[in-house]
Amino acid sequence: MKDFLPAFWAVIPAAGIGARMAADRPKQYLQLGGLTILEHSLLCFLDHPRLKGLVISLAVDDPYWAALPCAKDARIQRVDGGSERSGSVLNALLHLHAQGASDNDWVLVHDAARPNLARSDLDNLLGELADDPVGGLLAVPARDTLKRADSSGRVLETVDRSLIWQAFTPQMFRLGALHRALADSLVSNVSITDEASAIEWAGQSPRLVEGRSDNIKVTRPEDLEWLRQRRTEFGR
């Protein structure tokens, strides 16, 4: 890892509702240790000295953001989100271009509901990818036995996990390359699940940088309960 870490922009797509949480508000606005999940997800970036600025993509009718203290942070700029993650990220990238950001600038895209990113993981990602020609993402090697199933839920085979990784965020790519990949994939009606898949579709191979397994995304109620319990155990 390089001793000198590159400057970067952060993009947080936060226009989703998180239906699987079955909560009274979008999951990023649920409480975790006195702050919302979203605030925790932002903090690791806002505390970093190499941050150039942060763009958050929000639902047009979002009623929660303005009440958060961080909404007044001058380093954070708000844009309207899209109907899908890729559209929300693309809107943020277009905003960065309009603000004069360079195609060669690094952009880190992070899930709004991934509140446990460690500073050490962020620094490691920045250092490992500083000179990478493509970029990459935090990820964790698969640990459990993996099964491939048919449409009825019956096991077809056990998958070799030795080369299987779970994709996490942040995902770090050059602004211009990511902008082109997302825009082209949308025009071609390609299903894009994360930024790395857009770069893959464009013919590039992102690098996997191993991170901590506790950098989880809150998707179901038990995920939030696990994080709350963990914070209690460690006194945070």
UniProtKB/Swiss-Prot annotation:
Pathway participation: Isoprenoid biosynthesis; isopentenyl diphosphate biosynthesis via DXP pathway; isopentenyl diphosphate from 1-deoxy-D-xylulose 5-phosphate: step 2/6
Keyword Transferase assigned: yes
Residues marked Positions MEP for the nucleophilic attack (site): 161, 217
Catalyzed reactions per annotation: 2-C-methyl-D-erythritol 4-phosphate + CTP + H(+) = 4-CDP-2-C-methyl-D-erythritol + diphosphate
Domain of life: Bacteria
Keyword Transferase listed: yes
GO terms assigned for molecular function: 2-C-methyl-D-erythritol 4-phosphate cytidylyltransferase activity
Keyword field: Isoprene biosynthesis, Nucleotidyltransferase, Transferase
The protein's role, per its UniProt record: Catalyzes the formation of 4-diphosphocytidyl-2-C-methyl-D-erythritol from CTP and 2-C-methyl-D-erythritol 4-phosphate (MEP).
Matching HAMAP family: IspD (MF_00108)
Family: Belongs to the IspD/TarI cytidylyltransferase family. IspD subfamily.
Name assigned to this protein: 2-C-methyl-D-erythritol 4-phosphate cytidylyltransferase
